[in-house]
Structures are given as C-alpha cells and as structure tokens.
A protein has these predicted regions:
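N-terminal, post-signal-peptide region of Sec/Tat-exported proteins
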Residues: 41-88
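Short, low-order "capping/linker" segments at domain edges
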Residues: 107-133
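Bacterial Sec-dependent N-terminal signal peptides
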Residues: 1-25
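Secreted/processed peptides and extracellular or luminal domains of membrane proteins
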Residues: 43-46, 120, 135
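Surface-exposed aromatic
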Residues: 28, 67-74, 105-111
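Short glycine-/aliphatic-rich beta-strand segments at the starts of folded cytosolic domains
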Residues: 22-34
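Conserved short beta-strand edge segments in small beta-sheet-based binding/regulatory domains
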Residues: 94-106
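Short, surface-exposed ligand-recognition loops at beta-strand->loop->(often short) alpha-helix junctions
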Residues: 32-42
Length: 135
C-alpha cells in the first residue's frame, strides 16, 4: 500500500513537471487598415481557419477582430507559430499587417470594400459596414 501511494505521489510530481514545460499562449495585436468591414472579417476568418490547420500546426488558439480600430488580436503558441508567420498569413489573405503590405495577387481577390482607402475601399460616408446587415 505504501508503494502504491508513493507511486501516485511520484506521478503527480512528474505530471506537474511536464506541464510546467509547455509554452503558454501569448497575444499579439496587428494593425490592418483594410480590415474595417464585416465582409473583410469573414474572408480573413475563413482563411485563418484553413491556414491554421494546414501550415501553422494549429498554433493559433483564437483571434479577435476589432473592425472599428482595424486590428486583429491573435493568441498563439510561440513554439509553433511566430509573429512573422501570422503577419505573412494576413498578407497572403490579402490584408496589410502592420507595416507589411498584402501580396498583390491576394489583394486583388478580396472584396472591393476590403481594399485600402486610397484604392476606394473601406467604410463609405453614412454607410457603416462594421455591423453585418440584418437579413
């Protein structure tokens, strides 16, 4: 009986030690000036879901998109994904990420409202687009 209790105690300590070695998820905030409308949010979320499963080893835990501020907060595991990989994923989806511009081919495929303001995209006067219209 003493050996059994000792074995359980050892397993608990070993389990605690192994859990302590796992990297914790961290947050990063990335500005994207052409991420202002709900359509853009849907396009980016679809892309990130596919990208997370295929190329990022499921390193993205969650993301929150603030359309009014034009930014995305991403929680990720740093042992699987780097901030540069996240910015590259945004660029490949057609969106600017901080100071890095989107890939031109991908930028051409996003909806017109998701284009940069200098290209005529984004919210128009008296036509807010940060809220999905009621259908």
């Amino acid at each position: 009986m003493k050996q059994f209790i000792l074995l359980i105690i050892c397993c608990l300590f070993l389990g605690k030690f192994l859990y302590a070695q796992q990297d914790k998820a961290v947050w990063i905030t990335i500005k994207s000036e052409n991420l202002k409308c709900w359509e853009c949010k849907e396009v980016l979320e679809k892309y990130l879901i596919v990208e997370n499963k295929s190329n990022m080893e499921s390193g993205l835990v969650q993301w929150k998109i603030n359309l009014l501020q034009g930014e995305i907060r991403v929680q990720y595991f740093p042992d699987r994904v780097s901030p540069d990989m996240i910015r590259t994923a945004l660029n490949n989806a057609g969106f600017d990420a901080d100071s890095e511009k989107a890939i031109e081919d991908a930028y051409k495929t996003i909806p017109a409202i998701c284009k940069r303001a200098i290209d005529g995209g984004g919210p128009q006067p008296r036509k807010p687009c940060h809220i999905q219209p009621i259908q």
